[in-house]
Curated annotation (Swiss-Prot):
Residues 1-16 are virion surface. It holds the Pfam family CoV_E. The keyword Transmembrane helix applies. This is Envelope small membrane protein. It comes from Bat coronavirus 279/2005. Plays a central role in virus morphogenesis and assembly. Acts as a viroporin and self-assembles in host membranes forming pentameric protein-lipid pores that allow ion transport. Also plays a role in the induction of apoptosis. It is found in: Host Golgi apparatus membrane.
Length: 76
């Protein structure tokens, strides 16, 4: 039978296609990891803004009120 391409050329084409698909999979995995990290940072920011900052604000506010009035630090 006649062959349209030689064995070496066919192997090169197949290897090139496989390398291209491997690169695409690598890019997809990298993008998925970066997206997950970005989502994690976003969620950590929500926790910081909604829980940590108000707690620190209330703590410092009560401490300032107690120190200015001469009341012992019972609330802190």
């Amino acid at each position: 039978m006649y062959s349209f391409v030689s064995e070496e050329t066919g192997t090169l084409i197949v290897n090139s296609v496989l390398l291209f698909f491997a690169f695409v999979v690598f890019l997809l995995v990298t993008l998925a990891i970066l997206t997950a990290l970005r989502l994690c940072a976003y969620c950590c920011n929500i926790v910081n803004v909604s829980l940590v900052k108000p707690t620190v604000y209330v703590y410092s506010r009560v401490k300032n009120l107690n120190s200015s009035e001469g009341v012992p630090d019972l609330l802190v």
